[in-house]
């Protein structure tokens, strides 16, 4: 919980920092708190849809909890954003995850 507390403290002064929000969501996943991680990822992607890495992690979280249809949509949105940003590796990872769920 120490890392979570540190990240929360940093977010108090930098509430719009996408990196900190993403890092906090990952810490919640490590602690087994998928619900809190999901809220953070969803908020982050609403406010900063270009933060490409969060799509993959949110998609994997959704897969883990059995929300496959939403995971597919998240991967699709992430692939669009990755293409816009020219992030081919991120695009490929999300495409692979999407294909695994689709077929």
Please give the residue ranges for each predicted region.
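Structural marker of alpha-solenoid helical repeat scaffolds
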Residues: 13, 47, 64, 81-85
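TPR/TPR-like (Sel1-like) alpha-helical repeat modules
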Residues: 68-87, 99
């Amino acid at each position: 919980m120490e890392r979570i507390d540190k990240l929360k403290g940093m977010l108090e002064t930098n509430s719009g920092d996408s990196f900190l929000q993403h890092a906090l969501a990952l810490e919640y996943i490590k602690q087994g708190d998928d619900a809190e991680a999901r809220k953070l990822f969803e908020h982050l992607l609403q406010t900063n849809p270009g933060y490409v890495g969060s799509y993959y992690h949110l998609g994997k979280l959704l897969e883990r909890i059995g929300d496959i249809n939403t995971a597919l949509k998240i991967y699709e949105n992430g692939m669009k954003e990755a293409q816009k940003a020219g992030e081919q590796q991120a695009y490929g990872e999300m495409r692979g995850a999407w294909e695994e769920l689709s077929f």
